[in-house]
Amino acid sequence: MSRESLYISACHPYEGSMAENHTHWLRKENTDQTKASFPELFFDLVFVFALIQLSESLSDDFSLGIAAEAVLFIFALWWVWIHTTWVMDLLDTEIEPVRLLLFTLMFFGIVMAIALPEAFKGMGLLFAVAYSAMQVSRSLFALYAFRRGDPASFMTFFRITAWLTISSTFWITGGLSEPHLRVVLWIVALVVEYTGPTVRYWVPLIGASPRETLDIDGEHLAERSALFVIIALGETILTIGKHTFSNLETEGTPWVLCFSFLTTVLMWWIYFHDGQQRAADKAEDTSKPQTTAQYLFTYGHLPIVGGIIFTAVGEDFSLAHPYQLGTYNFALAQLGGPILFLAGTMWMKRVSSRVLPYSHVFGISLLTASFTLVPFVANFAIQALTGVILLVVAVWEYVALKHLRRSAA
């Protein structure tokens, strides 16, 4: 008998009616859970607040150091959200224990978001404890829910819990440390968390999780990921509206408003017009749903979300200082955000259809080349150029897809 079998035998000593005590917390087989539930949507509101906190922190002081810290926070926020989404994909979110879990995670999430702007100052420990509480408590709940369910899934969550417990020690130790060491320890914590799925949460003595152990609903994960993109775009709209109102008397604000709104709409179009549905179809139809979902959503959506957040910060700069000559610091957000976004959507479309969207390659190339113009043009011109380049990408892809469909017909 393998070591893993011994662990399973120890954790499943009883059969019969007791199995029903916890397995009814799980999503029922053959149940259509494609649509996000109301408890999940309610949970997402915490991340609206968290993204606003992050965006405003960046807008207040966009130095290279602050930008690096923001990248760390984007990795952390995305990881805690996508892990929660995976767990909710397996559980029945309409029953009370699972709803109570979501409400508990919401509370920890609010505390985490409150601490976020000062996480590298006086609130590091609060941020670390709240983040770790979300990760570990959710994983322990899933472990308990699967205790009388599928043994392979139970062991997968046993491994995940072990990995998240290790990463939490780095988070909390970092929260107790001085800022320079805190950065290092929190980076180590994120490396641990992001490495886990790639090595299938290998644990000494019991090894790695078998492939495709979790009975996930790929279409549900696709919708949830798309909703997070909507959250990020919504935060962008809030930023545009707030800072347009704050700068109404500044000459050039109406033009920057138009180009900022155009940029945001085009990001929506590039993601949703074709790519999101293709990703959902791929996740639903593949013979390897768990692996495909990791490529498309767990890792693939991170640059999409990060790109939208940085684009919002760049739009804020352009609205606040439309006629100021560009700087490379600001351009990291103004041009780097759309580059990240296009890279992420290109990856998603490549994985889901095995066709490389050359329009995205062209757009990334133009945006990268635009860095050479930064010191010579004003912020509003950089914003306008970004909007025009994304428009070219969107029109190119639209025409190319229309041609492909005609050819296929």
Swiss-Prot record:
Topological category with respect to the lipid bilayer: Multi-pass membrane protein
Name assigned to this protein: Uncharacterized protein RA0937
Entry GO CC: plasma membrane
Organism, as annotated: Rhizobium meliloti (strain 1021) (Ensifer meliloti)
Keywords, in A-Z order: Cell membrane, Membrane, Plasmid, Transmembrane, Transmembrane helix
Subcellular location: Cell membrane
Pfam families in the cross-refs: LtrA
Stretches that traverse the bilayer: 62-82, 100-120, 123-143, 152-172, 183-203, 252-272, 293-313, 328-348, 355-375, 376-396
Principal cellular location given in the protein's record: membrane
Disulfide bridge map: none
